[in-house]
Amino acid sequence: MATEHIENKLKLLPDKPGCYLMKDVNGNVIYVGKSKNLKNRVRSYFKSKQVGRRAELVREIRDFDIITVSSDKESFLLEITLIKKYQPYYNVQLKQGTGYPYIEITNERDPQTRLTSIVHKDHGYYFGPYPNVYAAQATLKFIQKVWPLRRCTGHQGRPCLYYHMGQCLGACFKEVPKSTYDAQIRKIKRFLNGDIAQVKQDLTEKMTQASMDLEFERAAEIRDQLKYIEQTVEKQKIISNDHTQRDIFNFYVDKSWISIQIFFLRQAKLLRRETRLFPLTDTNDPQDAFVSFIAQFYGQRNRVLPKEVLVPAGMDNESLSEVLKVPVRTPQRGQKKALLEMAHDNAKLKLDEKFRLLELGNRKTKGAQKEIFDALGLPYGHRIESFDHSHIQGADPVSALVVFTDGEADKHEYRKYKLKGEVEHQNAADEVGNTREVVRRRYSRLLKEHKKMPDLILMDGGQIQVEACLDVLRNELNVNIPVAGMVKDDHHRTNHLIFGDPTKGEELKLIPLDPKSEGFYLMTRIQDEVHRFAITFHRRTHAKNALSSKLDEIKGIGPKSRNKLLRKFGSLKKIKEASVDELREAGLTLPQAQTVKLSL
């Protein structure tokens, strides 16, 4: 529901093209969009029911701004600028760069070949990126041996080591003609562009000769070199008739998700591909999200623009081309059209795969939780809360609460309780008293703060715990939450549930679950998790209390001094190991530090 402030602004929206900036309660821009008609588009966010990611966005909007322009093309260019400026949360968020290295031929008087992960526009020739870093390093070493350029810092007045090894042309002590560099660079570029037939033939002959000469280590080195060349230079089969560097983008949309597939063609070969999947914020215009993605994609660090970008029909190619500064085309027939369709098919395949994996995951989460509710005869609920207690012969009693939402642990909602002990139940080991106390504290607070109650409470225990929990909920708090107990067998293994409501005259009954069902597995996960959480909390509490008790026995050490030591050292062992000076650094006086040292 829109606020009065937003409703008033909606009435003033113009029927013009432009961009809109959605803002949260802190005034931060959380989404940037564009439209041919700002009035219709912005109003649609607040005047119709939203689902998915768009619903999440609308819930956070507290204000918006608009910027009008004279054409849809201008709104597209402005949108890209605003997204780059504000990096809004609900716009497509791209990861920074691939991190893969390039082989660079530097643009210098005395050029060199090197591996780099940073691309400087117009600073040289770049080849890659190469996903196999080790193969790229080996290929670079091969280039430096076969077609050397400069390998040293240059101009040092004497030949460098690499010159003596034949891996440097000698810029270190003489002027190397530019024509010599140019000839070497042409050979390197041909090699990195895929002209490797002669190189492979020469290496194969050398490998064969080394084997015949029983130089097996040398033969193995050459074999590995051939493999690295194939991984970096010859990696893919030829799939096109021309050698234009081009990137191919296509997409597929389903269930408010978009899958984008990118093919990188270099020297008529498919060098690599990338897939991006993300939920759509504006499901009405997936084309806008697609085009915005492409524009942001090349704004990333180390992204090298190709000579041509191919996109499917229906895109604003002219505006996108203006942003990218390279031709953006839509092929109508032939190999390019086939590659575009292949990118679409791969995008669909990836999104279908994601949904299948989500479905399998749901069987173990939502599906498993539904099995538990069905077994208890309850309508499906999203939230389960579970309690367990821990103590050592009544000492340092604690309780722990874990929360599972739609079958998954929601650790941000976990809670820990140090039990104080009821008046009528002074024995801290008493399960009834512990259960009553923690249930009362938990749900009286939820009532006071008007927070949502769980759909089911699972007690780690049997009839005693369930009846104590129900007594507090029904008779003290007047809360009607279903409660079941997770019962273990004689071997301390999860066995079944116990369910009913004696406060309403219902008998507690054993509810079996199929041990091979997902619902049974979820029940054991909940029981194991709440037990783990309670035990871990108790160990820490007991250790801390034991340390405090030990320090309390030392004459002259009061609560303030004790807390200083606990903050500084954290454990009795570290306090014992500390010197008098270190104890004084914690804030103790010299007599106190000496007393602690002697007492421990």
Swiss-Prot record:
GO terms for cellular component: cytoplasm; excinuclease repair complex. InterPro entries: GIY-YIG_endonuc, GIY-YIG_endonuc_sf, GIY-YIG_UvrC_Cho, RuvA_2-like, UVR_dom, UVR_dom_sf, UvrABC_protein_C, UvrC. GO terms for molecular function: DNA binding; excinuclease ABC activity. Coiled coil: none annotated. CDD domains: GIY-YIG_UvrC_Cho. Residues 15-92 form the GIY-YIG domain. Signal peptide: none annotated. The keyword Cytoplasm applies. It is found in: Cytoplasm. Keywords: Cytoplasm, DNA damage, DNA excision, DNA repair, Excision nuclease, SOS response. Belongs to the UvrC family. The UvrABC repair system catalyzes the recognition and processing of DNA lesions. UvrC both incises the 5' and 3' sides of the lesion. The N-terminal half is responsible for the 3' incision and the C-terminal half is responsible for the 5' incision. This is UvrABC system protein C. It comes from Lactobacillus johnsonii (strain CNCM I-12250 / La1 / NCC 533). The gene is uvrC.
